[in-house]
């Protein structure tokens, strides 16, 4: 939840979810 994955999730889900990222405030974060 604190490390930005460099991906937004405004229109599509986080592709980086495969490495543990999740959507938060329209941006993908991990941890």
Swiss-Prot record:
Identify the domain of life. Answer: Eukaryota
Disulphide-bonded residues: 5-21, 9-23, 14-28
Instruction: Reproduce the UniProt comment on modification after translation.
Output: This is a cyclic peptide.
Enter cross-link residues for Cyclopeptide (Gly-Asn): 1-31
Keyword Disulfide bond in annotation: yes
Q: What does this protein do?
A: Probably participates in a plant defense mechanism.
Q: What is this protein called?
A: Cyclotide vpub-A
What organism is this sequence from? Viola pubescens
């Amino acid at each position: 939840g604190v490390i930005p994955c460099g991906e937004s999730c405004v229109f599509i889900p986080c592709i980086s979810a495969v490495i543990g990222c999740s959507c938060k405030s329209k941006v993908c974060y991990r941890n």
